[in-house]
Amino acid sequence: MNPLIQSLTEGQLRTDIPSFRPGDTVRVHAKVVEGSRERIQIFEGVVISRKGQGISEMYTVRKISSGIGVERTFPIHTPRVEKIEVVRHGKVRRAKLYYLRALQGKAARIKEIRR
């Protein structure tokens, strides 16, 4: 990578990001702007993918809301996310859990592991 670009992006990287992987259940505290007000919205779900590296790294969180699957993709180092909490660690054998989109109910459960 170009040294100039690398030096610029190093200042933008966040250091308060917890360690999480696909299969983990996370609670994301995202800042939402509504008109002139700003509030925190909590989005809790299973991490189904993590992709990219450095400043452009992103993760996708999936949850079921009123029987409908909702997915949201967040950049890891964005200032729009106040904090990320890891609720539980899941045991999976894949890096991308896109197959969860086709599963419903008990079939979509992920076994918990102690870490």
From Swiss-Prot:
Keyword Ribosomal protein in annotation: yes
Keywords: Ribonucleoprotein, Ribosomal protein
Transmembrane segments: none
GO molecular function annotation: structural constituent of ribosome
Signal peptide range: none
Annotated Gene Ontology cellular component terms: cytosolic large ribosomal subunit
Gene Ontology annotations of biological process type: translation
Record-stated family: Belongs to the bacterial ribosomal protein bL19 family.
Known function: This protein is located at the 30S-50S ribosomal subunit interface and may play a role in the structure and function of the aminoacyl-tRNA binding site.
Protein name: Large ribosomal subunit protein bL19
